[in-house]
Amino acid sequence: MTTVRTRIAPSPTGDPHVGTAYIALFNLCFARQHGGQFILRIEDTDQLRSTRESEQQIYDALRWLGIEWDEGPDVGGPHGPYRQSERGHIYKKYSDELVEKGHAFTCFCTPERLDAVRAEQMARKETPRYDGHCMHLPKDEVQRRLAAGESHVTRMKVPTEGVCVVPDMLRGDVEIPWDRMDMQVLMKADGLPTYFLANVVDDHLMGITHVLRGEEWLPSAPKLIKLYEYFGWEQPQLCYMPLLRNPDKSKLSKRKNPTSITFYERMGYLPQALLNYLGRMGWSMPDEREKFTLAEMIEHFDLSRVSLGGPIFDLEKLSWLNGQWIREQSVEEFAREVQKWALNPEYLMKIAPHVQGRVENFSQIAPLAGFFFSGGVPLDASLFEHKKLDPTQVRQVLQLVLWKLESLRQWEKERITGCIQAVAEHLQLKLRDVMPLMFPAITGHASSVSVLDAMEILGADLSRYRLRQALELLGGASKKETKEWEKIRDAIPG
């Protein structure tokens, strides 16, 4: 009997996402329930955004939750390497095979030509797609241009009519028309693969038998299915999990809810409570109990109990469940968990340099640095009264800063400063005009340790969470203001 093998393949491009933990949990439970294996693979082909620091954060966050894997970059295994950036020669081999078989072709189209084609198609109200310009180039021309070092990509061929039947373990057969599919790029100009080629090659070579992934990938499933067909490989069974959603039913995003696992760790949530809550996202125990352990979830796991309705990730419900876990701990367990959270040596070392020069005894630390250890901070509207800005302008500045910070890919002091500086300059203000608003929003006080250093230490999600709280206290933005301010945001450089 074939051993069940599942995997999670996150990209190390930022803080580890609760959506990654959610999909990892269900893959882990499915594998363990069937006596199988769970693999961690790192999809780091986006060399501009991928970092080893983010990769380490993924390991730390999943292990904090109690999710362990049998094979991966850090633990090894018989199917390595487990980082896609280290498998380039493998993808090149299979990409060349597709070209040789006539299932893919070399494309020399420039970005400028592709943009022009898309613009023409959109003007005709057509779905933008590649027009096949390079699909039938003579072989000698292709070889000549390759020998000349001309920039190129490899694209797969796809049918233009009919439907692809996608067998989904949750929905049954799903029919998707081929005319919705573009001629997908498989190998980029930098020699690295796109998600589609790397995904299929890796899943096959690593013996993955079942793929549980988010339903946002369902519309592009025909491309993956066609690649398996082109290679002549057996396709894993597919399961498209419902997406986590905000309370307003929109897709879970950092603009409306904190999404990083690190945020919930910093806020003092218990890992077993967060894992329990993620387990309840679209799934339920046979007896409908709300509180259960990972071992209990594995024991009773059955995909037939997954609901296709978009599960709502509600911070209030998570907090309620976390409270249930806390109250059922012994006093000794509770004290140990508090100590582990409050006296985290790594976190304290980040804070200490900013506090040491401002205190004369240790009892002064709590009032000065308490905001580093809380979720929200006590907010006083009077602290946002500004000598130069009226209340509407105050809200506008905070909203614009929040939006700019939401688009920040790397959370570093210099980049945070750059975002705030860009907003100030665009509004013809000085940085010193904006900073008095940042102090109360982030620290709850009119003055404190460097607020920019504090934001770097607190992290992206917690900093943005506090800015949202400050905006809500001051009345937020009306629909009309939001539209007007979005135009201003889009005009701000950077």
From Swiss-Prot:
- Which GO cellular component term is one of those annotated? cytosol
Q: What InterPro entries does the record point to?
A: aa-tRNA-synth_I_cd-bd, aa-tRNA-synth_I_codon-bd_sub2, aa-tRNA-synth_I_CS, aa_tRNA-synth_I_cd-bd_sf, Glu-tRNA-ligase_bac/mito, Glu/Gln-tRNA-synth, Glu/Gln-tRNA-synth_Ib_cat-dom, GluQ/Sye
Q: Which named protein is this? A: Glutamate--tRNA ligase
Question: What EC designation does it have?
Answer: 6.1.1.17
* NCBIfam families found in the cross-reference section: gltX_bact (TIGR00464)
Q: Where is this motif: 'HIGH' region?
A: 10-20
Q: Where is this motif: 'KMSKS' region?
A: 251-255
- Per UniProt, the enzyme's principal EC class comes to ligase
Cofactor, how bound (note): Binds 1 zinc ion per subunit.
Where does the chain bind Zn(2+)? Answer: 107, 109, 134, 136
Q: Name one GO molecular function term.
A: ATP binding
The record's section on PANTHER family has: GLUTAMATE--TRNA LIGASE, GLUTAMATE--TRNA LIGASE, MITOCHONDRIAL-RELATED
> The organism sits in which domain of life?
Bacteria
Q: Which SUPFAM superfamilies match?
A: An anticodon-binding domain of class I aminoacyl-tRNA synthetases, Nucleotidylyl transferase
Give the organism the record lists.
Pseudomonas aeruginosa (strain ATCC 15692 / DSM 22644 / CIP 104116 / JCM 14847 / LMG 12228 / 1C / PRS 101 / PAO1)
Q: What does this protein do?
A: Catalyzes the attachment of glutamate to tRNA(Glu) in a two-step reaction: glutamate is first activated by ATP to form Glu-AMP and then transferred to the acceptor end of tRNA(Glu).
Q: How does it assemble?
A: Monomer.
